[in-house]
């Protein structure tokens, strides 16, 4: 039988504004401001998705010495994805700002400028010169190859992007899209 003693410690995730006490209407204003910053950048902006995600995590850790540590952790993140298209080509730009804090993090960011910058980048990469393909040696550390594949290819293969016609892989079922030496299985 153990006698548990709570351990006091310095909490690193103290917050000033609990996101779960802020009315939804105020949270919507944050994502609307982000959206408004992006929407008028160019007529080539065809889609803007903004999100605000706030989490509250209760953590309890116990050990065999009878010590118990309890904490509540908050994470807040605001995100924007902008799709630019010229009718032939399409480019997507994603960016986010987040902290292990409450909604006081919004005091540190100009959401209009953040949205505008993301939209400008989407348009800029839409008009960027094509990369010149070339063969280069690649060495991938064991275990990390999946992450590289995911970031390079799998985001474009996600069903929602393909179904909405936002992916370079749209309408490619049955077509060869990679080298014969590449095998990728999504299970």
Task: Name every feature range the model reports, one short phrase each.
Residues 1-187:
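Active-site bordering "gate/hinge" segments
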């Amino acid at each position: 039988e153990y006698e548990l003693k709570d351990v006091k410690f310095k909490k690193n995730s103290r917050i000033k504004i609990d996101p779960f006490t802020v009315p939804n209407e105020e949270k919507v204003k944050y994502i609307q401001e982000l959206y408004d910053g992006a929407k008028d950048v160019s007529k080539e902006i065809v889609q803007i998705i903004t999100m605000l995600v706030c989490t509250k995590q209760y953590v309890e850790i116990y050990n065999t010495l009878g010590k118990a540590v309890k904490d509540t952790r908050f994470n807040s993140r605001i995100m924007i994805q902008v799709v630019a298209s010229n009718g032939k080509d399409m480019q997507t730009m994603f960016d986010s700002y987040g902290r292990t804090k409450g909604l006081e993090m919004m005091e540190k960011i100009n959401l209009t400028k953040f949205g505008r910058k993301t939209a400008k980048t989407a348009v800029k990469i839409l008009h960027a010169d094509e990369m010149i393909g070339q063969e280069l040696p690649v060495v991938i550390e064991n275990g990390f190859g999946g992450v590289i594949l995911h970031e390079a290819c799998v985001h474009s293969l996600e069903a929602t992007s393909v179904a909405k016609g936002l992916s370079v892989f749209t309408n490619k079922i049955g077509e060869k899209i990679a080298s014969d030496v590449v095998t990728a299985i999504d299970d």
